[in-house]
């Protein structure tokens, strides 16, 4: 591995690494690898590829969170209209310089919650992949923020959120999923039960398309990698004690 550059980020030092064996590139902020991709920007993370697949039928997509910009790059290359928001301006420069993010993709430097409140456009899809050292998902995705996300979707729109979960005892995915299911949306959780410090995806679709949603989720579930499970959220109240998450494996 060799270091292509080091930069000052808002949450710690950002380092860009490159594998001399494979050519893959890595975006590391603080102690966390935010992105891993080919030199052309194709993500190596399974969850990013799942987010890309989930947004396959969309035309306009709002991405909250940049990192190496892999998801934005992959969607833009499909001809989608992509808008990216991140609080760290250096992320956009690094995504374009090292990870192939097209220069024409609109990038906005802003706190994602403030951006949602100010934005007036509606989108076919919204993807959320934010985080970093000290980030608390339960605090950041409170009911008001979840409402702001859904408010920026078209009536037929969909949303998908990536979050980090420490253990099966973490109730945050269920709380956030329940809040995202208010109003006209419904949600599912993709998880890796039993793993520590894992990625969890929350996928949201319009409630009124129940039959179409079941068909879509069943079809989408068959495309995901080994080990992922699909379930509906439980409804713990905020402030409740954590409980073991009941997971049902996909067939």
Residues of each region from the PLM?
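Conserved S-adenosyl-L-methionine
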Residues: 184-195
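SAM/dcSAM-binding transferase cores
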Residues: 1-41, 49, 194-251
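General small-molecule cofactor/ligand-binding pocket signal
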Residues: 17, 106-108, 188-190
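The AdoMet/dcAdoMet-binding core of the Class I SAM-like
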Residues: 6, 42-152, 158, 168-177, ...
């Amino acid at each position: 591995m060799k270091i292509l550059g080091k930069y000052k980020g808002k949450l710690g030092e950002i380092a860009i690494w490159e594998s001399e064996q494979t050519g893959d590139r890595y975006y590391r902020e603080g102690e966390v690898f935010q992105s891993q991709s080919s030199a052309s920007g194709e993500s190596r993370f399974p969850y990013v590829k799942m987010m890309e697949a989930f947004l396959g039928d969309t035309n306009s997509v709002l991405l909250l969170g940049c990192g190496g910009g892999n998801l934005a790059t992959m969607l833009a290359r499909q001809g989608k209209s992509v808008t990216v928001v991140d609080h760290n301006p250096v992320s956009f420069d690094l995504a374009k310089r090292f990870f192939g993010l097209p220069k024409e993709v609109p990038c906005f430097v802003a706190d994602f919650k403030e951006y949602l409140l100010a934005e007036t456009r509606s989108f076919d899809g919204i993807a959320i992949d934010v985080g970093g050292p000290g980030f608390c998902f339960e605090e950041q995705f409170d009911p008001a923020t979840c409402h702001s996300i859904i408010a920026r979707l078209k009536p037929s729109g969909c949303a998908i959120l990536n979050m980090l979960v420490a253990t099966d005892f973490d109730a945050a995915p269920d709380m956030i999923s329940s809040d995202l299911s208010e109003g006209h949306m419904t949600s599912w959780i993709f998880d890796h039960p039993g793993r520590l410090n894992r990625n969890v995806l929350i996928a949201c679709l319009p409630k009124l398309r129940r039959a179409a949603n079941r068909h879509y989720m069943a079809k989408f579930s068959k495309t995901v990698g080994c080990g992922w499970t699909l379930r509906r959220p439980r409804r713990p109240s905020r402030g409740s004690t954590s409980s073991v998450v009941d997971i049902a494996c996909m067939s």
